[in-house]
Curated annotation (Swiss-Prot):
Chain segments annotated as transmembrane: 72-92, 100-120, 134-154, 161-181, 190-210, 225-245, 256-276, 289-309, 316-336, 340-360
GO CC terms, sorted: endoplasmic reticulum membrane; plasma membrane
EamA domain boundaries: 83-205, 236-360
Identification of the protein by name: Solute carrier family 35 member G1
Domain of life assignment: Eukaryota
Subunit structure: Interacts with STIM1; stimulated by depletion of intracellular calcium. Interacts with ORAI1. Interacts with the plasma membrane calcium-transporting ATPases ATP2B1 and ATP2B4. Interacts with ATP1A1, ATP2A2, KPNB1 and XPO1.
Keyword Cytoplasm: no
Provenance organism: Mus musculus
Keyword terms of this UniProt record: Cell membrane, Endoplasmic reticulum, Membrane, Repeat, Transmembrane, Transmembrane helix
Entry annotated with the keyword Disulfide bond: no
Gene designation per UniProt: Slc35g1
Length: 368
C-alpha cells in the first residue's frame, strides 16, 4: 500500500489483480475494491481532469453507454501515484529523531481518521463478511509489518536502494502464488526471479563477492545491510499480502481492507515501540507536518494506483510504475546530494526488467 502500504506493494497489488469490475486492489498490493468517488451515484458524465473534456468516459455512467476513458488518464494516475508514494518516502527519510515504527503508528492514526467516515458512508461495517475475517486479519498483520520494515529501510539505507529492492515484490508474489494458490510457475518466472536476485546482490554488494569496497555508501556497511534486509523483508511480506488479497477475491470492500491494515498496524507498532523503548515526541514544526502528510500521501497513492488499473492495461501500468525508482533516484540526488552508485543503477535495471517482465507476462496469460 510508500510506502505500503508502500508503493511497491500497492503497485504490484493493483497490477496483479486488475479485473473489469475490480473491487479489490494489491503496492504492492490484487484484491481490494476500487474507489471511484466521482462515479459513485453519478448517472451522467462529468468533466474530466486533466483533459477537460465533458464527453470523456472516465466518469461513471450506465454501462451500456459507457465509452473509453480519457486517453492516457490511467497512466497519469500511475505517475501521480508513484510521485505521492515517493514524496511520502522522502518525508520518512527527512523526519528526525522518530523511529520507523513510530512513523508507522502515526500513519495508521492519520489513515484511520480518514477511513472511519468512508466506512460509515459506504455502510460496509467494520468487521467484514464471514469466511473472510481470518484473511482480513492476516492481511492487516502482514501488510502493517511490511510497512514498518519499509520505513526502517528508508531510515537506514538510501532511498534508491530501498525502493529498488522493494520493487522486487511481484517476483516473490509469483513464488507464493505457486505455493499457496497452485498457480503455474514457469521457467520464465524462475528466470525473472533469478534476475531480480542478481539485482539485489548488486545493491547489497556482499563482501565475499565484492570484497571490502564500500565506496559510494553514505551509511556504514552494517546499517546498509540492516536496511537491505528490511527492504527484502518488506518485499516478502508484501507478496504474502498480495496472495491473501487474491485469495479473498472481490468480496471485500477496498476501505475495509485498509481498515484492517491500520487497526491492526497501530497496536502492533505501539507494542513494538514499548518493547524496544524507542517512543519519542516528534519535534515541533516540519517533523509533525511530515508525519501527517506521510499518512495522507500514502492513502492518496493507494487510491490513484487503484483507479489507474481500472482504466488502463495492466502491462502499461507495470511499466509506468518504474517511475517509483526514477523519483527515488531524483529525490536522493536533489535532497540528500547522494548520487546512486553504478552498482545501484545496475541492480535497479535487473529488478525493473524482472518485475516488469513477470507482470506483463502474467497479464498476457490472463488476457488469452
Amino acid at each position: 500500500m510508500g510506502p505500503p502500504e508502500s508503493a511497491a506493494e500497492l503497485a504490484a497489488e493493483a497490477v496483479e489483480l486488475r479485473e473489469p469490475e475490480l473491487q479489490l486492489a494489491d503496492p504492492a498490493s490484487p484484491g481490494e475494491e476500487h474507489v471511484d468517488v466521482e462515479a459513485e451515484g453519478a448517472p451522467g458524465r462529468g468533466r474530466c481532469w486533466p483533459c477537460g473534456a465533458w464527453a470523456c468516459g472516465s466518469r461513471g455512467e450506465p454501462e451500456a453507454k459507457k465509452k473509453a476513458p480519457c486517453p492516457g488518464l490511467g497512466l497519469f494516475y500511475t505517475v501521480l501515484s508513484a510521485f505521492l508514494f515517493s514524496v511520502a518516502s522522502l518525508f520518512v527519510k527527512k523526519v528526525q529523531g522518530v523511529h520507523a515504527v513510530e512513523i508507522s503508528a502515526f500513519r495508521c492514526v492519520v489513515q484511520m481518521l480518514v477511513i472511519i467516515p468512508c466506512l460509515i458512508y459506504r455502510k460496509t461495517g467494520f468487521i467484514g463478511p464471514k469466511g473472510q475475517r481470518l484473511f482480513l486479519f492476516l492481511r492487516g498483520v502482514f501488510g502493517s509489518s511490511a510497512m514498518i520494515l519499509m520505513y526502517y529501510a528508508f531510515q537506514t539505507t538510501s532511498l534508491a536502494d530501498a525502493t529498488v529492492i522493494a520493487f522486487s515484490c511481484p517476483v516473490f508474489t509469483s513464488i507464493f502464488a505457486w505455493i499457496f494458490l497452485k498457480e503455474k510457475y514457469s521457467l520464465w518466472d524462475a528466470f525473472f526471479t533469478l534476475f531480480a536476485i542478481a539485482g539485489v546482490i548488486l545493491i547489497v554488494r556482499p563482501p565475499f563477492i565484492f570484497g571490502s569496497d564500500t565506496s559510494g555508501m553514505r551509511e556504514s556497511y552494517s546499517e546498509h545491510i540492516k536496511g537491505t534486509f528490511a527492504a527484502i523483508g518488506h518485499a516478502v511480506l508484501a507478496a504474502i499480502t498480495l496472495v491473501i488479497l487474491r485469495k479473498m477475491g472481490k468480496s471485500v470492500d477496498y476501505f475495509l481492507s485498509i481498515w484492517y491494515y491500520v487497526i491492526l498496524g497501530l497496536p502492533e507498532a505501539i507494542i513494538i515501540l514499548f518493547v524496544i523503548g524507542e517512543w519519542s515526541l516528534p519535534y515541533c514544526g516540519l517533523d509533525r507536518l511530515f508525519l501527517i502528510l506521510i499518512g495522507l500521501l500514502g492513502l492518496g497513492g493507494q487510491i490513484f494506483i487503484t483507479k489507474a488499473v481500472q482504466i488502463e492495461k495492466a502491462g502499461l501500468v507495470a511499466i509506468m510504475k518504474t517511475m517509483d525508482i526514477v523519483f527515488a533516484f531524483i529525490f536522493q540526488i536533489a535532497f540528500f546530494d547522494n548520487v546512486p552508485t553504478w552498482w545501484t543503477v545496475g541492480g535497479a535495471l535487473c529488478v525493473v526488467v524482472s518485475t516488469t517482465g513477470a507482470t506483463i507476462r502474467r497479464w498476457l496469460q490472463g488476457s488469452k
